[in-house]
From Swiss-Prot:
Belongs to the cytochrome b family. Component of the ubiquinol-cytochrome c reductase complex (complex III or cytochrome b-c1 complex) that is part of the mitochondrial respiratory chain. The b-c1 complex mediates electron transfer from ubiquinol to cytochrome c. Contributes to the generation of a proton gradient across the mitochondrial membrane that is then used for ATP synthesis. One of its GO terms (cellular component) is respiratory chain complex III. Keywords: Electron transport, Heme, Iron, Membrane, Metal-binding, Mitochondrion, Mitochondrion inner membrane, Respiratory chain, Transmembrane, Transmembrane helix, Transport, Ubiquinone. Its cofactor is heme b. It is found in: Mitochondrion inner membrane. The keyword Cytoplasm does not apply. It comes from Herpestes edwardsi. Signal peptide: none annotated. InterPro entries: Cyt_b/b6_C, Cyt_b/b6_C_sf, Cyt_b/b6_N, Cytb/b6-like_sf, Cytochrome_b, Cytochrome_b_C_euk/bac, Cytochrome_b_N_euk/bac, Di-haem_cyt_TM. The gene is MT-CYB. This is Cytochrome b. A ubiquinone binds at H201. The cytochrome bc1 complex contains 11 subunits: 3 respiratory subunits (MT-CYB, CYC1 and UQCRFS1), 2 core proteins (UQCRC1 and UQCRC2) and 6 low-molecular weight proteins (UQCRH/QCR6, UQCRB/QCR7, UQCRQ/QCR8, UQCR10/QCR9, UQCR11/QCR10 and a cleavage product of UQCRFS1). This cytochrome bc1 complex then forms a dimer.
Length: 379
């Protein structure tokens, strides 16, 4: 009799995706982040579900309901802080995952890469709407400022913003619809993640050398299941240290003040994982130009495969491109720091220079360095 694992229509799919999947024998810990993102997503859906049982999406009671969760619900504070810091872990894993794709040339799997970009946008939208729900000062003003950016779109901008708000300002209608979208989007993300995996399994995984590994494959289980569990334990340890020792480390103190439309906080800023894009937005004096730069800072990932000039796939054997890649990482960290600073003299200039460098590295320097390395190898 055939093993049920290989014959049952449903279990067979799981088997081919997670058990008998042929995987390259040399993939490093950088390939852990896909499974970690899956765990993050499940964790966020579960904690979010329990939070939604106690949350009320009304401007008068939203802030109080979050306080009620933290004070009165059994272990509500753990659930709330796991959800808030879980989002941070989600984005850390996302950035590492995308960085891995950039470094090792995984973007040559075009369908997988493009679904990944779509996933990144969807996760960012979900996180933004989730930040609005506690209805603190930063929630309200963050929602006002970021949604207001759409008014820069010519002709339809103002109508579009009022349509999203459901009125003439961010109010009850906005909060209710944001809660509805925040609840449904993670399930859409789950579906997209399944498609992402489907496309990946059409081609098989890339590996650090960038060389085709069809001749040297090993089963995913037990080798990579054990390896992924190590990464999972490290991530859960970091998450729980954050949750149990300094749950507000990555949050904004202003969000412990209930939303007040009559009082603007001195410095409006989003969560840390959006700061790099926020810095790029602020470094352009023109509103429409800033919005375009903001969108392009992520959309630029879609043209990375078209700008690949090197004869080699990954950067493992390309020291010049490696230097450029780590310069890009340093630049993104600089942008993240600048996004959290007030808009005044040294920070404005640093932000503008870092923004120019960001686009220059991806659009100009990386293709040039790829060509130079091709020439060097000919000698």
């Amino acid at each position: 009799m055939t093993n049920i694992r290989k014959s049952h229509p449903l279990i067979k799919i799981v088997n081919e995706s997670f058990i008998d999947l042929p995987a390259p024998s040399n993939i490093s810990a950088w390939w852990n982040f896909g499974s970690l993102l899956g765990v993050c997503l499940i964790l966020q859906i579960l904690t979010g579900l329990f939070l939604a049982m106690h949350y009320t999406s009304d401007t008068l009671t939203a802030f109080s309901s979050v306080t009620h969760i933290c004070r009165d619900v059994n272990y509500g504070w753990v659930i709330r802080y796991m959800h808030a810091n879980g989002a941070s872990m989600f984005f850390i894993c996302l950035f590492m995952h995308v960085g891995r794709g950039m470094y090792y040339g995984s973007y040559t799997f075009m369908e997988t890469w493009n679904i990944g970009i779509l996933l990144l946008f969807t996760v960012m939208a979900t996180a933004f709407m989730g930040y609005v729900l506690p209805w603190g000062q930063m929630s309200f003003w963050g929602a006002t400022v970021i949604t207001n950016l759409l008014s820069a779109i010519p002709y339809i901008g103002t109508n579009l913003v009022e349509w999203i708000w459901g009125g003439f300002s961010v109010d009850k209608a906005t909060l209710t619809r944001f809660f509805a979208f925040h609840f449904i989007l993670p399930f859409i993300i789950s579906a997209l993640a399944a498609v992402h995996l489907l496309f990946l399994h059409e081609t098989g995984s890339n590996n650090p050398s960038g060389i085709l590994s069809d001749s040297d494959k090993i089963p995913f289980h037990p080798y990579y299941t054990i390896k992924d569990i190590l990464g999972l334990l490290i991530m859960l340890m970091v998450l729980m240290i954050l949750v149990l020792f300094s749950p507000d480390l990555l949050g904004d103190p202003d969000n412990y003040t209930p939303a007040n439309p009559l009082n603007t906080p001195p410095h409006i800023k989003p969560e840390w994982y959006f700061l790099f894009a926020y810095a790029i937005l602020r470094s352009i004096p023109n509103k429409l130009g800033g919005v375009l730069a903001l969108v392009l800072s992520i959309m630029i990932l879609a043209i990375v495969p078209l700008l690949h000039t090197s004869n080699q796939r990954g950067m493992m054997f390309r020291p010049l491109s490696q230097c450029l890649f780590w310069l890009l990482v340093a630049d993104l960290l600089t942008l993240t720091w600048i996004g959290g600073q007030p808009v005044e003299h040294p920070f404005i200039t640093i932000g503008q220079l870092a923004s120019i460098l960001y686009f220059s590295i991806i659009l100009i320097l990386m293709p040039i360095f790829g060509t130079i390395e091709n020439q060097l190898l000919k000698w």
